[in-house]
Amino acid sequence: MTMPLPNKTTGVTFLHQIQSSELETLTRPPLKISLERPLGEMYVENNRTGIFNYPEGTTYDFAAAAAPVYSSASLSYAASSETFGSSSLTGLHTLNNVPPSPVVFLAKLPQLSPFIHHHGQQVPYYLESEQGTFAVREAAPPTFYRSSSDNRRQSGRERMSSANDKGPPSMESTKETRYCAVCSDYASGYHYGVWSCEGCKAFFKRSIQGHNDYMCPATNQCTIDKNRRKSCQACRLRKCYEVGMMKGGIRKDRRGGRLLKHKRQKEEQEQKNDVDPSEIRTASIWVNPSVKSMKLSPVLSLTAEQLISALMEAEAPIVYSEHDSTKPLSEASMMTLLTNLADRELVHMINWAKRVPGFVDLTLHDQVHLLECAWLEILMVGLIWRSVEHPGKLSFAPNLLLDRNQGRCVEGLVEIFDMLVTTATRFRMMRLRGEEFICLKSIILLNSGVYTFLSSTLESLEDTDLIHIILDKIIDTLVHFMAKSGLSLQQQQRRLAQLLLILSHIRHMSNKGMEHLYSMKCKNVVPLYDLLLEMLDAHRIHTPKDKTTTQEEDSRSPPTTTVNGASPCLQPYYTNTEEVSLQSTV
């Protein structure tokens, strides 16, 4: 059988037949088939059947379960100028970023929905095209449209979450949320005694380390919260103190081994009357090795309240003047009144000093030495304290108030008078309290003879270390009272410094008063009593210009004998019984 030779007409006719067959295939009714595996998720619409055409000419129909599908009318086939693809095809998106297939068209990025398996089981699947071929793949999680790096991060988070679910609960899940006690922001930790945020912690640290003279522009009642905490520094600092912030604040539930050891040592120290130098060093007190065999004062076992109470009970009684208000004051009469008052107050001052806690534990030599160095300073600070309630006047006694004009009758007294009135004004401005006054007076007694410079005839102290220990105890009591009064830490430090600075002015006034009193003695203006005269001789100031005069006076005056370092006029105030008791305790 011979085949006819193909010609151009026959080829064209054959091509038309193929195209007609393809068009017939496209227009035939869709054939429903069952797949071995269900297809994946597709974006469907209006709960209709979605028709998908394949190059083989077979059409598959998938019914969506209560999910919208594309209608057949919405799908179109655009003729391609190239085989299996054209640049004119739009709206086609594949999952593996390959050239789009000319068969499947989607209007926008699909959000896949699960199809119903032919057995009724709902399993997600999706279609994948590879160079014109199609395969049914198992659908990935809804985030499979992300990039590969996002997929890796997502899978890593899923593995971490699954591991956390299997393991014990994490610290973040069990950590209790704390809020700042000042501004109610999230607290970063326990700072300065309260739960606070980093901002309030840093603000309080700056305030206690530097200057905090903040002024509120309003009424000191500004609202301090997370948003308005920076609006008013004064009110913010006030609230920090109100909620309990303090320097060195620690959590009470954090008690490490070091704190427990310190507490145990403190309890052992309170049970013992004998304190060794190592325990004194823990209290920040340096002790000489020569103190090892010394029995220290029981004042160390006293609390601040007990020490204040003992000092209040030791206060001397009120001394009245013999002044007759009907008679005018002259230089001689005024000096007689003042020296008489001073002599009687000296007796009470010695009794007061012996009742100061720890003073009688010193040697007799040191007791006399301290009294001879501090007697005029103690009398002057008592005069200043009595004059606080009388502005512009000095209250030498309840019945003897003198102003500046009355002090002019005595030569050289006006300068000392003005300094005393100025110091009384300073006490009044500071609103000095009685507890602070008695502590200051005790500090003057114990501190005056530590650095002797008024007389070259006085010997050095014997129990300097013990004097420092008692002095530190009284200073600690003063600080404790300031803290108890409600002052902030910076206010306590400032007030303590101001009070201690006043002591130097009192020392200066004492030196001026000693010079004036000694000049009155040399002029024989007024007779001095034995006790006052002895105290004055102990404070004679030696200068180059009057050194020869002083030596002549010393040669004319008979030598004074002392017993155990006590001056003759002070010996009646230290009986033999007291001397024996003092020596037994040292």
From Swiss-Prot:
Residues 180-245 bind DNA. One of its GO terms (molecular function) is nuclear receptor activity. It comes from the Eukaryota. Keywords: DNA-binding, Lipid-binding, Metal-binding, Nucleus, Receptor, Steroid-binding, Transcription, Transcription regulation, Zinc, Zinc-finger. One of its GO terms (cellular component) is chromatin. Residues 303-539 form the NR LBD domain. Residues 144-173, 252-276, 543-569 are annotated as: Disordered. One of its GO terms (biological process) is regulation of transcription by RNA polymerase II. It holds the Pfam family Oest_recep. PROSITE patterns: NR_LBD, NUCLEAR_REC_DBD_1, NUCLEAR_REC_DBD_2. A zinc finger (NR C4-type) spans 180-200, 216-240. It is found in: Nucleus. Disulfide bonds: none annotated. Residues 252-264 have a biased composition (Basic residues). Residues 1-179 are annotated as: Modulating. Residues 246-302 are annotated as: Hinge. Residues 149-160, 265-276, 543-556 have a biased composition (Basic and acidic residues). SUPFAM superfamilies: Glucocorticoid receptor-like (DNA-binding domain) (SSF57716), Nuclear receptor ligand-binding domain (SSF48508). The keyword Transcription applies. The steroid hormones and their receptors are involved in the regulation of eukaryotic gene expression and affect cellular proliferation and differentiation in target tissues. Composed of three domains: a modulating N-terminal domain, a DNA-binding domain and a C-terminal ligand-binding domain. Binds DNA as a homodimer. Can form a heterodimer with ER-beta. This is Estrogen receptor. The gene is esr1.
